[in-house]
């Protein structure tokens, strides 16, 4: 969960499950190029169990660390992660357990970025790894959901702070871009948006049906994001769990706002725009054209606001 949804997580009683989904009538077209096959394997990153998704072909692949929502198991992001990997990323999705305000659970923290850089270097050097000599060790990008999104935003400033880190620490020099879903920088228990003094590009993907991290909160955070490039990419019909394999994963605070876009369409849309944003910020001219020119017009479910 993000800063705002942390107050929801702290409740001991949770609301009933969300209303039934309504299947969307429109499906956004995929980019013209065919996606490569993707494989996966289990590993550990600094002691955390992690799933790694990667294209079966290609070299010098940048690493994308995915920071989970609070108490959302990594398995719930398998479709999103595999889709993101199909665009040419090594996607690492760890389960990170720690104690936060006296409660133990799945809570990501900024130190994971540095751990992932170390893991990537070791994996690239490991002859037994399927990623041996295939990783771009100099490029790290972040994707995050909810609390993981807020953690990624904290890292985007160059200095991760509590509660998004156990202790304050700096972002690794390899970090080049951030994309979030269902994230904001609203001060817990208030409607006050804190400024994001980012030093790397940040893209906010926002479900317009999100009842946990609302569109107004996301837009307020975007408006107070000082560094550029930045983008606010709204997705019609997705709620807080539009990025997961299914609605309201077990253990996580539910979103009672109903999603109206088909779940599979929502996940594909969020993953595609995540990939295109990250590629655009790491040197792809085709992705820049997609993000800033053609993608919005081609996707009936998405509206993009940006500052280059």
Predicted features by range, described:
Residues 1-34:
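Secretory targeting and sorting signals
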Residues 32-60:
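N-terminal cap/lid segment of alpha/beta-hydrolase-fold proteins
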Residues 60-69:
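Short beta-strand element of the alpha/beta-hydrolase
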Residues 75-98:
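Short amphipathic alpha-helix adjacent to the substrate-entry channel of hydrolases
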Residues 105-150, 158-162, 287:
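Gly/Ser-rich "nucleophile elbow"/oxyanion-hole loop immediately N-terminal to the catalytic nucleophile
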Residues 151-155, 213:
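Hydrolases whose catalytic domains are alpha/beta-hydrolase-1, hotdog thioesterase
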Residues 167-240:
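The feature captures the conserved acid-bearing segment of alpha/beta-hydrolase catalytic domains
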Residues 237, 246-308:
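Alpha/beta-hydrolase-fold serine-hydrolase catalytic core, especially in secreted/extracellular enzymes
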């Amino acid at each position: 969960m993000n800063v705002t949804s942390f107050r929801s997580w702290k409740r001991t009683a949770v609301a009933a499950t969300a209303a039934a989904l309504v299947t969307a009538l429109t499906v956004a077209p995929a980019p013209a190029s065919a996606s490569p096959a993707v494989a996966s394997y289990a590993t550990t990153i600094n002691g955390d169990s992690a799933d790694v998704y990667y294209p079966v072909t290609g070299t010098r692949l940048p690493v994308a660390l995915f920071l989970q929502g609070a108490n959302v198991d990594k398995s719930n992001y398998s479709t999103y992660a595999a889709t993101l990997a199909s665009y040419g990323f090594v996607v690492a999705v760890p389960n990170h357990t720690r104690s936060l305000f006296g409660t133990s659970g799945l809570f990501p923290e900024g130190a994971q970025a540095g751990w992932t850089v170390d893991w990537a270097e070791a994996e690239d050097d490991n002859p037994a790894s399927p990623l041996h000599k295939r990783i771009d060790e100099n490029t790290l990008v972040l994707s995050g959901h909810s609390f993981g999104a807020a953690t990624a935003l904290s890292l985007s400033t160059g200095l991760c702070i509590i509660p998004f880190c156990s202790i304050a620490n700096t972002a690794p020099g390899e970090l080049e871009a951030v994309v979030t879903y269902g994230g904001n920088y609203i001060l817990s228990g208030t409607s006050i948006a804190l400024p994001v003094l980012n030093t790397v590009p940040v893209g906010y993907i926002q479900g317009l049906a999100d009842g946990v991290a609302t569109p107004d909160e996301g837009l307020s955070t975007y408006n107070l994001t000082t560094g550029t490039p930045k983008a606010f990419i709204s997705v019609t019909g997705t709620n807080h769990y539009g990025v997961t394999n299914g609605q309201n994963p077990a253990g996580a605070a539910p979103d009672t706002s109903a999603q109206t876009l088909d779940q599979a369409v929502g996940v594909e849309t969020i993953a595609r725009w995540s990939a295109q944003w990250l590629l655009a910020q790491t040197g792809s001219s085709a992705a820049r054209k997609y993000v800033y020119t053609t993608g919005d017009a081609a996707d009936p479910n998405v509206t993009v606001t940006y500052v280059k």
